[in-house]
Amino acid sequence: MKQHFPLKDIQQEKRIYRGRIFFAVGLVIICLLVLASRYAYLQIFHYDEFSTASDKNRIRLQPLPPARGYIYDRNGVLLADNYPVFTATLSKADVENVDTVIEQLQPILELTQEDVDRFKSRIKTARKTERVAIKLNLTETNIAKFSEVKYKFPGVRIETQMTRYYPHGDLFAHVIGYVGRINDKELKSIDKDLYAGTNLIGKIGVEKSYEDLLHGTPGYESVEADAHSNILRHLGRKDPTRGNDLYLSLDYGLQVVASQQLAGRRGAIVAIDPRTGEILALVSSPSFNPNLFVTGINHKDYSSLRDNIDQPLYNRAVQGVYPPGSTIKPMEAMGGLHYGIVDWATAISDPGYFHLPGDSHKFRDWKKTGHGIVNMHKAIIMSCDTYFYILANQMGIDQMNQWMRQFGFGQKTGVDLPSESEGLYPNPEWKMRTRKSKWMKGETISVSIGQGAFTATPLQLAMATAITANHGSHVVPHVLRATHGAKPFTVRNAPDGKINFNGTDEDWVKMREAMIDVIQSGTGRGIRTPLYQIAGKTGTAQVKSIAQGKRYNEAALSERQLDHGLFVGFAPADKPEIAIAVIWENGRHGGSAAQLAKPVFDYWLLTRKKNPIRPANHQVNGGLMTAGIKPGELPSGNESASSTPATSAPTSAAASTPQATPTRPATNEVDE
């Protein structure tokens, strides 16, 4: 049977085909229009915006941390140096999961939990492309282990950064201080742009006081990097500005000598140029090695320092407060002249004690049998307590307080070191405010000989002595002598005023002569010398109170219950170049403290001019980088002196800070 097939409708098929073509062409045109509009959006209307965003993905600004300024002594001896260390770093832009990377790096870089916590704290506030230190001061073993698995951590780099090094170890620790890693509290207060790429900041001492000068200004380098943070091109840079170099008023040789005197002892020595207020030496013993703190002290070392009964971290010279004992008698005597209560001829008969009218309690002199007929000159020479009991009773605590504050007691000196203590010059208002009780007249008597609640720092005693040497002119103590660098800074060396004194200049001369006689024939006669004249005053401060009627029995006391020995003085007496304050904790009496001051005077006035102590050559006017020396290759601070007198600072002396109980003074048979 024959099949029949319908004929094709050619026209209809053409229409269908043509429609499909038009649809396809239209679809292509629409797609092209979408692409063209998107292209116009990106490349024409928002070109600048997206071009910048694109560049940010491949062009980065890397901070260039500034080199920290060096610190020198007055003669150019290098006290604080910079040294390169290897540091592991990363940025948030380089890794997908920061926590995972850090966890994987812990066994490789031997990260402690403290390292991890510090890194996480810093990375939180860092910019996305800012590189943050994971660990400072990597060892060769750390670097070798990381090199083997480096391919697993494309965003982690080993970089060279500068860190701090103190070539003289514990010798200047309490003055210079140290730098340490920036902590959470500091992160909130610093200018993050100014500290970009920086891990260290001044913590105590000069490093903290002059952080703004020492730190410098960071620079930046523009680089092109790929997705793995590998640098492809260096596009340009702005160099950092290094911090200012600081030249301190301290003298290396004098610091060595002063430190030697306190080796194995607890105490402090402060030496000042009374003409300018420049601090020539400042020693607190025992001391510590500041290098332990720079890249992070471990728990064991810190616990050893913190829990040490001798408190090596405690700056006795600036923070330590002690009863000043008889060292303040020259200043107090000048107050008697100021108020017209006594003159140089005023004399008393000293039976060895004093009692207030209507009170049977005896305030005893240190010399049980008394000093006989005593005028002001003899009272200073023999350190007659009874004379000052009578003077204080006539002067009264209010006038005493007003007068003694002019010498700086009970207030900060304004020294350019942090954490200075005010000490305390007690008065009725203070007692009512703090103890809710009235002032007793017997307390005035105790204060008159530097006991009771009266406390002062060694720095305050040195300043009061400098004011006495200056005939009342006041200078501000300071350790900064000069700076060199991009940041201007003016150091003041001129006297900033004079105390209000109603007497004459001749009165100051007579006081100087009395203090000279203290050394020639009085309680300080153990340090007299024909080579120059010293004007001084000894002092003894009770640590353990003694009941009325009881004798001071040294044999019955422990070593830490023995009296403190103090000494203040200046020399040459007629044209003072140096004023000194010494506190020897539990040193028994002021004569012992004077023995510690004598070598300091000798070095400054004699030895320094002929045979000054200098450290090894590579520690003068340069850095470890210049000398090509690693910290481990340096001798310790104790081995660096090249002259024979006084070889070192103390490394582990003994000391706590016992305070004298504020009670009525009792008999003390020890010669002050």
UniProtKB/Swiss-Prot annotation:
The keyword tRNA processing does not apply. Pathway: Cell wall biogenesis; peptidoglycan biosynthesis. Belongs to the transpeptidase family. MrdA subfamily. The chain crosses the membrane at residues 21-41. This is Peptidoglycan D,D-transpeptidase MrdA. InterPro entries: Bact_Transpept/Beta-Lactamase, Beta-lactam/transpept-like, PBP_dimer, PBP_dimer_sf, PCN-bd_Tpept, Penicillin-binding_protein_2. GO terms for molecular function: penicillin binding; peptidoglycan L,D-transpeptidase activity; serine-type D-Ala-D-Ala carboxypeptidase activity; zinc ion binding. Binds one Zn(2+) ion per subunit. It comes from the Bacteria. The gene is mrdA. Monomer. Zn(2+) binds at D350, D365, H371, C384. Gene3D superfamilies: DD-peptidase/beta-lactamase superfamily, Penicillin-binding protein 2a (Domain 2), Penicillin-binding protein 2a, domain 3. Its cofactor is Zn(2+). The keyword Cell membrane applies. Disruption phenotype: Viable under standard laboratory conditions. Spherical cell shape with increased maximal cell width. One of its GO terms (cellular component) is plasma membrane.
